[in-house]
């Protein structure tokens, strides 16, 4: 299917926070309770619609283990959006967010949109990190924030789509150079066709005006 833009995402965070499950829920609308550890990088894609335009999301799910960190770093470059995930039932995954964020900002495009996600909101009885703590961290670092559940699908759609909306707004504001694919954005055939139609219409109007 033709798309107007392609946005590249990267999902980062500690091992076991539910990165692969979030991706699977978003792309396939299913939950897999037992998931093999991601080795290196896995990939998923899905089409969404923003402002009447088809947007293709190309999503890279990275390994959380320290031994794969150098591989993860190479995927920061060329990403327009990042989902930084922690597990609300494991305080240590929240404590490691600063390290992940520093890594992301050091190796990525400065305009990359980062969504902070507190995953496993269905496990409220085992919560170790308050929602207010996630909100405060996001405010302090200029991130978007949501709590999600890959198991129940709560807020999963919204997390991926709201990140895309933020990227799209930055394109409209001229923040992203969409002609530079290193920014994680690719112009699709639908966008090119629309522009060609607009140019043709403008040309026709100008020619018509010259006859009067």
Curated annotation (Swiss-Prot):
Keywords: Cytoplasmic vesicle, Endoplasmic reticulum, ER-Golgi transport, Golgi apparatus, GTP-binding, Hydrolase, Lipoprotein, Magnesium, Membrane, Metal-binding, Nucleotide-binding, Prenylation, Protein transport, Transport. Mg(2+) binds at residues 20, 38, 61. It is a lipid-anchor. GO terms for biological process: autophagosome-lysosome fusion; Golgi organization; protein transport; vesicle-mediated transport. Belongs to the small GTPase superfamily. Rab family. This is Ras-related protein Rab-2A. NCBIfam families: small_GTP. It catalyses: GTP + H2O = GDP + phosphate + H(+). It is found in: Endoplasmic reticulum-Golgi intermediate compartment membrane; Melanosome; Endoplasmic reticulum membrane; Golgi apparatus membrane. Its EC number is 3.6.5.2. Switch I, switch II and the interswitch regions are characteristic of Rab GTPases and mediate the interactions with Rab downstream effectors. The switch regions undergo conformational changes upon nucleotide binding which drives interaction with specific sets of effector proteins, with most effectors only binding to GTP-bound Rab. GO terms for molecular function: G protein activity; GTP binding; GTPase activity. Regulated by guanine nucleotide exchange factors (GEFs) which promote the exchange of bound GDP for free GTP, GTPase activating proteins (GAPs) which increase the GTP hydrolysis activity, and GDP dissociation inhibitors (GDIs) which inhibit the dissociation of the nucleotide from the GTPase. PROSITE patterns: RAB. InterPro entries: P-loop_NTPase, Rab_GTPases_membrane_traffic, Small_GTP-bd, Small_GTPase. A lipid is attached at residues 211-212 (S-geranylgeranyl cysteine). GTP binds at residues 16-21, 38, 64, 119-120, 122, 150-151. CDD domains: Rab2. One of its GO terms (cellular component) is Golgi membrane. Its main location: endoplasmic reticulum.
